[in-house]
Structures are given as structure tokens and as C-alpha cells.
């Protein structure tokens, strides 16, 4: 409680002025020196796609084929981190992740009139769920209710909710993505900024070395900088 805290710490005003993240306290002590570089210095970091209804917009290969939906409006999307055993995702010749659980995002950019004439099966699928799905907050706030956010495949992704991975014991995982899959909002997508991107283009081993360094980071350092979630 406020009057009988489990943990307390006295932090000087000067330390607080230098500290960008006060939620580190009281678990952590004041930093001896300020970190000069952050991940955002090297990467543009975006959360993954919030679909509005994963069950409707994210389908398996079997579901797509059973419904007779056109492959032209789907692109691969990574499953939940718990379905990815390794921290490196390989791809087949089509860029689809070589995972046991392969999922695809419905990502159609055509207006409804065009969908109706070009893809009748897709039109029927959209119409069947329009009443329930289109009225959801994220969907109804879009220009067209089934349009998805633009998230290109990222070479590096991070599981960021901060709950410890039971297999590795790590609160965060950095995944090296060789596929053309995007990801949902249980991931952060890391896109190299121009300077790093140019360096990676000249040295194709650099992305792997960066990934190895990120996964070697001390868990305490990551937890100290990450968001805090309840539950």
C-alpha cells in the first residue's frame, strides 16, 4: 500500500532530472551514467498490425482454400510468439515462413464495388461478417472497414509485452525474420534507419550480428527500459 510499501527507495532530484524513465524506480537504482544510444537511434520501431478481429482477418491455408478466397488478397503474417520455437524464421521460395503454423492476413485494398465484381467469394465473406466485424471500433474508424494498416515485413521483430518466455527464461525475444511476413501487435517491428540500412546492404552479415547482440542483452536492462503491464 501507499503507507506500507513492499519496496521503497530514496532518489535524488538530480538523478530524477537525468532519468528518462521514472518507472525504473524503486526496483532499480539511479544510473551511474546516462545511456548515450537507444534502439530508436538505429531503428524505426512500430508496433505490429491491430487487425480489429484476428479470427476474421487472419486465416490458415486450409481456411482460405475451404472458403475459396483469392490468394491475391492475402499475405503471410507471423503467428503468436509461442508458436515460434526458434528466434530465426526461415522462408520458402515464396517468402512464406517455414513454420508449422502458417497464417495469412486478409489485406485487400480494393473498394467494395471492385471486390464485388472481381472476387465474388471474398465479397460474400465480407458481407457475411459485415454486421459484426465492421462495427468494431478499429474497423469502423477506417476509411474502408477491412483495410489494414501498412506494415511491411521487418528484418527484426521483438516480442515486447515483457512476460517471461517459459522456454528461454527471457522477457523479450528478438526474432530474425527472413520471410516476407508481417506481424500482429504482439510484436514490435524494427526497421533499420538509413545509416544502418546502408551498412547492412554493404555487409550482409551485419544484420545477424546485430540480432545476436540484441538477444545477448541483459534481461534486467531490457526490463528496466520496457513498458510495465499488469496481469
Predicted regions: what they are:
Residues 1-46, 52-54:
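Flexible, glycine-/basic-rich loop-and-beta segments that form/coincide
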Residues 30-231:
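Polybasic, glycine- and aromatic-enriched phosphate-binding surface used to engage nucleic acids
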Amino acid at each position: 500500500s501507499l503507507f506500507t510499501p513492499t519496496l521503497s527507495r530514496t532518489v535524488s532530484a538530480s538523478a530524477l532530472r537525468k532519468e528518462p524513465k521514472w518507472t525504473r524506480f524503486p526496483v532499480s537504482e539511479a544510473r551511474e551514467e546516462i545511456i548515450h544510444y537507444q534502439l530508436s537511434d538505429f531503428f524505426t520501431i512500430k508496433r505490429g498490425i491491430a487487425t480489429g478481429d484476428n479470427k476474421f482477418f487472419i486465416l490458415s491455408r486450409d481456411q482460405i482454400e475451404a472458403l475459396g478466397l483469392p490468394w491475391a488478397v492475402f499475405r503471410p503474417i507471423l503467428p503468436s510468439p509461442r508458436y515460434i520455437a526458434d528466434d530465426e524464421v526461415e522462408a520458402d521460395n515464396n517468402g512464406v515462413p517455414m513454420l508449422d503454423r502458417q497464417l495469412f492476413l486478409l489485406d485487400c485494398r480494393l473498394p467494395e464495388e471492385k471486390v464485388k465484381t472481381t472476387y465474388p467469394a471474398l465479397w460474400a465473406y465480407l458481407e457475411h461478417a459485415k454486421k459484426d466485424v465492421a462495427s468494431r471500433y478499429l474497423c469502423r474508424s477506417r476509411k474502408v472497414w477491412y483495410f489494414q494498416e501498412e506494415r511491411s515485413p521487418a528484418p527484426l521483430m521483438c516480442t515486447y509485452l515483457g512476460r517471461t518466455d517459459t522456454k528461454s527464461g527471457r522477457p523479450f525475444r528478438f526474432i530474425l525474420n527472413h520471410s516476407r511476413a508481417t506481424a500482429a501487435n504482439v510484436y514490435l517491428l524494427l526497421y533499420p534507419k538509413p545509416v544502418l540500412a546502408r551498412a547492412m546492404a554493404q555487409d550482409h552479415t551485419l544484420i545477424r550480428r546485430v540480432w545476436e547482440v540484441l538477444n545477448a542483452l541483459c534481461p534486467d536492462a531490457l526490463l528496466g527500459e520496457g513498458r510495465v503491464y499488469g496481469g
